[in-house]
């Protein structure tokens, strides 16, 4: 290839910019920035398309922090009320619900810490930054749900085996009704819905793919916590109504705790699957490998695509890397630009890395160039 080979690594807007060259600047004087072939006056930078993704990420984090702070305050107030009410009533179900709220509060703090970490700049050791801290925090929150639910199921079984306890139905009913109201408020605060639209620049665009932005991982984990508590609160209210009208049916307290604990565990399955997909660097839900490949092949001059990888740093920070082969080596710059702009226009990628290669350099026997299995 003519000239020295150069590679550029440019960080996000909030981080420092680095330029790594194979040869030192002493041997090669600084060159003017690359310009568009058709219009020498216009400049094309490889990260021009990342601004929307960066701005969306900043809005997402600010929005998530605000929701988590409000939810934490409300959660703390109702935890205090439930602990006092459950102690007075002698109800395991009420104390169980308070324990769930306490775990929720802890998960909110974990989520806030992970959001703070994920906003830190990248380093030479962590070149992607701390984005995965958000995923790890969400995973920790899900694990705490399983642990606490397991403890509560054990306590419910103990009460079924040894029914030597009394319950104040009136206090239990009042407390459980307040708890249900608290969880409904928390669910409304943490609920998020999104659509695959971009409103940047006053435009209203639709992505060509079926991808829809997923909920922030921290908010999603917190929401799952609250949904679990909502199920638990419903179970407490049901058992409270039974005990209030039929005090001799106090077994309803541990039975409802046991039954609704199963529903709590079921609510974590989907979010746990998505978190593990991110950690395993799997293709994010809603983005199809074949669609991305076809959009690259549709660019004039691209003859083949291999080493195509799709993964995500967080739920909504999707990354693409690929090698493309062309028989028009003289237009490598134009092909690189067209492919990059095409995939950014059709898919919500946070970062795209494309390597252009001459088609005669391809090796059919190369194991790294094989098409992935279904």
Curated annotation (Swiss-Prot):
A motif (HCH Motif) lies at residues 45-47. The chain crosses the membrane at residues 68-88, 92-112, 135-155, 170-190, 223-243, 252-272. Residues 18-48 are annotated as: Disordered. Residues 89-91, 156-169, 244-251 are lumenal, vesicle. It is a multi-pass membrane protein. Zn(2+) 3 binds at residues 45, 47, 366, 369. Keywords: Antiport, Cell membrane, Cytoplasmic vesicle, Ion transport, Membrane, Metal-binding, Transmembrane, Transmembrane helix, Transport, Zinc, Zinc transport. It holds the Pfam family Cation_efflux. Its main location: membrane. Zn(2+) 4 binds at residues 131, 350. GO terms for biological process: zinc ion import into organelle. GO terms for molecular function: metal ion binding; zinc:proton antiporter activity. Belongs to the cation diffusion facilitator (CDF) transporter (TC 2.A.4) family. SLC30A subfamily. PANTHER family: CATION EFFLUX PROTEIN/ ZINC TRANSPORTER, PROTON-COUPLED ZINC ANTIPORTER SLC30A8. Proton-coupled zinc ion antiporter mediating the entry of zinc into the lumen of pancreatic beta cell secretory granules, thereby regulating insulin secretion. This is Proton-coupled zinc antiporter SLC30A8. It comes from Xenopus tropicalis.
